[in-house]
């Protein structure tokens, strides 16, 4: 019988002692047994490292590496350098997957000779679960359709703007199965979050999708993404500068690869939508200071230029009102709508 292809499951771990056993149990109990589980303890200050060691001693498929804290991108890059499987899967240390995930993903990849397999996920809050729909049914993607997936990593276009809250639903690296050879051949890696703030997954996928010829989507909710509501907001001083680096990297990629006008428009839309994140970040301040921060964001040249070209026709009323305030440079309106969003989020 032909040997089944190995899946290398990469698990970055940082201070998740409370959830780590659930994650690891979901991996060691996969119905598809030909897996290696590569865990990188990114300088955890809790008992995460000890838990990893316990699992590593009891299951030969688990490799554990303890490193000084350098962030999730560094941890994933390190783990990737040790991977030997045909396929790569990422699972964060506080999340978990269904026990049939590897089996279903590998079957789909082999069935369609897919360079990428994707599936939706469930956001797991302390008191409820919320499925995140990506596509409504099973799909395969070829050539031009894979290019559209890549463009989605830059930003939304057209009717996609009807749901700005889903801008990055497709962009995670968990909920996907990758070909290790494709990653290695093209030297694809994760960017340091100290430089770009967030969205290391999206940049990874942007570069990976440039080389994907066939992709497949399974409509089963196989991944579980833990969301802890009620967390205290903390102001991220460097976020605006980091996102400028992110946008600059995207723009450089678009120009270098001659991606086209649709990628440019998608980036402008991403820059506009990022006002939401920057505004929510500002709400960590008292009201007067938060309002001053929001005025500063709205007056920035890059945001003024992007918001000027943002199409409004597809937005539902609440988003239309928010971006109308942005276009009008009406900081007080933006502030009040952000406060409403913050309350709704929890």
PLM features: residue spans?
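Short aromatic/hydrophobic "clamp" motif used to bind/position activated sugar donors
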Residues: 88
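N-proximal low-complexity "stem/linker" segments adjacent to membrane-targeting elements
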Residues: 1-28
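Membrane-interface aromatic/basic loop that binds lipid-linked glycans or pyrophosphate carriers
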Residues: 114, 252, 281-346
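A conserved acidic beta->alpha catalytic loop
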Residues: 26, 41-50
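Short beta-strand/loop segment that forms part of the nucleotide-sugar
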Residues: 34-43, 63-68, 92-93
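Donor-binding/catalytic cores of nucleotide-activated saccharide
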Residues: 96-211, 215, 227-233
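Catalytic core of nucleotide-sugar-dependent glycosyltransferases
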Residues: 220-229, 234-262, 273, 277-305
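Glycine-rich, basic loop-to-helix element that forms the pyrophosphate-binding segment
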Residues: 67-83, 96
